[in-house]
A protein has these predicted regions:
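Catalytic-core segments of nucleotide cyclases and related cyclic-nucleotide turnover enzymes
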Residues: 112, 116-119, 148-179
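Regulatory sensory/coupling modules that transmit signals to nucleotide-handling catalytic cores
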Residues: 1-16
Length: 180
């Protein structure tokens, strides 16, 4: 993944102590690099005729967390949510911050049912988190959208389905997993 990403002038690094991948973008290769790790996983799935799922997770009402409790609390929430996803993920899964309060998971060798089960475990783990702040207790929920690779897909196609299902999860009231 790192080698393929460097070809697009992007670097993916694992954050120390968190197990979470972060993206550092260089001018010029942003669009191609954004989907690079999904595309590498898709290429492997095509070669092996295996399964692949991409899950997008979004912290519900995150703007109001920042507005009400402050950006320090928002940072704490984001780190704790990311940590909960990393703990729930398998060692072979890629968990990356996708942007803002969105996280992306690439689950190689995982079909829709398995991805939905994992996302549900993650949703419950996030819902169980509690934060003590200067302005009182805080808890958050997370919405998940699951996209599954289908023969002939590319990385952006799988990601687009995950994004569409994340939007459906938000539209259906948040704090849920939508996989189909």
């Amino acid at each position: 993944i790192r080698r393929a990403c460097r070809a697009n002038r992007c670097e993916i690094q694992r954050r120390p102590g968190k197990g979470l991948f972060k993206h550092r973008w260089y001018q010029g290769g942003v669009h191609a690099a954004r989907f690079q790790f999904q595309e590498v996983a898709v290429a492997r799935a095509q070669r092996s005729k295996g399964s692949l799922s991409v899950v997008l997770a979004d912290i519900d009402h995150f703007k109001s967390v920042n507005d009400t409790y402050g950006h320090g609390a928002g940072d704490l929430v984001l780190k704790a949510v990311a940590g909960a996803l990393v703990v729930a993920a398998r060692s072979t899964d890629v968990v990356a911050r996708y942007g803002g309060e969105e996280l992306c998971l690439v689950l190689e060798g995982t079909a829709a049912e398995g991805a939905a089960r994992l996302a549900e475990r993650m949703r419950l783990a996030v819902k169980a988190l509690r934060f003590d702040t200067d302005k009182g207790a805080l808890s958050v929920t997370t919405s998940f959208g699951v996209g599954v690779w289908e023969a002939g897909d590319d990385g952006p196609g799988v990601l687009a389905r995950a994004d569409q299902r994340l939007y459906q999860a938000k539209a259906r009231g948040r704090d849920r997993v939508v996989a189909s």
